[in-house]
Amino acid sequence: MRPAVQASERTQTAMRSERAVAASAPESNASVIIPCRNAAGTIAAAVRTALAQSLPPLEVLVIDDESTDDSSAVATAAGARVIRCEQRRNAGGARNLGMAQASGDLIAFLDADVEIDAQWLARAVAVFRSDSSVAAVGGRIINGRPGRFGDLDLYLNHSEWISGTGRWCTTFPTMAVVYRRDAIGPAHFPETNYGEDTFFAHAVRARGGRIWFDPAIRIVHMHERLDARTFWSRQIDAGRQLYLTRRALKLPGKVLYRAPMLLALYPHLWIVLYRMLRRGMVVKALKLFPWLAAGETARIVGFLRARRESQRDIVMRPEGV
C-alpha cells in the first residue's frame, strides 16, 4: 500500500473512532485479565483503575502465578476475582488461564504494575466499532516512576509507543491492550515471561486482524524501582526476547538473527536516539546516552546468550527429535 493511501486510511480510522467514542453504549462486555506474581505493592492500583473505567468492564480477573506475598489478598480487597495457578505458568501461561476463564467478548490485558486511563475501554470499543478489521487497540506508554532508570527502561523498551499519531502496529505490549475475542480465535501465549506478547500479536495478525495505536489512551507504567543491577537484568531479558522473536517470526530486525555481527553497529540504540530527537528530547538524549549505550550492550549480551543456548540445544538434541 502506498504511503499516501496508508496516511489517509489512518486518518479515516482515527476520525471514525473519535465519532464512535461519543456514541458508545454504557457497557463494554470486556474481561480485564491481570497476570500477577509478587505484585502486592502495585496490584491494588491496577485493579482499581480497571474497575474505574468510564465504560465498566464485565469482570476483572487477577491470575496469581504462585505469588509468595500478599498479592491475592490485596487484589481481592481491591475488587478483583482472583484465580490461582496450580503450578508456575509464567506471564504467558497466566494470561492463557485468564482467557479460558473470561466470559467477555473483549479480552483486555493489563499488567499488575500499570495504572490505566479511565477511557481505555471506551476508546478501544470505539475503535472496534469504527473499523471491523481492528483486532487489538493499544495506547501511549508513560513512565510512572520518573528518574534515570525508569526513563532508560521506557526509551529502550517502549520508544515506539510513547507518542505519535494514531497508526497501525505490528505488535503491542500486553501491559495494556484490548483484543476482540473473535479475532483471537485459537491463538495463545507461549508460557514464558519474555516475548510472549509478540508471539501472541503475530498469531492474531496471521488471522487477518490489525493492531491500532491510539495515543489518547494513557498507560502509566508503575514498574518496580529499578537500580543498575535490575536495569541490566531487564535489558538482558529484552535481548533474549529479540533473539527468540526474530528467530521465529518475520519482524523488523529479522536480519539480526541471520547476521548477528550487525549488532556491533548498535542499530537499536540509533533507532531509540532518532525517536527521542524527533520528539525534541535533545538534552535528555545527550544526558542519557552513556546509560542508553550500556543498556543496549546488555540487550546484545542477552541476544547472544539466547543464540548460544539455542545452538547448544540443537547440538545436544538426539537425532530425530
Give, region by region, the residue ranges found by the protein language model.
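Conserved donor NDP-sugar-binding/catalytic core segment of glycosyltransferases
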Residues: 119-150
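Glycine-rich, basic loop-to-helix element that forms the pyrophosphate-binding segment
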Residues: 85-102
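Active-site-adjacent helix/loop segment of glycosyltransferases
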Residues: 211, 218-295
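Acidic donor-binding loop at a coil-to-helix junction in glycosyltransferase catalytic cores
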Residues: 193-202
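A conserved acidic beta->alpha catalytic loop
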Residues: 49, 64-73, 114
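N-proximal low-complexity "stem/linker" segments adjacent to membrane-targeting elements
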Residues: 1-49
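Short aromatic/hydrophobic "clamp" motif used to bind/position activated sugar donors
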Residues: 107
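Short, acidic, metal-binding catalytic loop of nucleotide-sugar glycosyltransferases
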Residues: 48-57
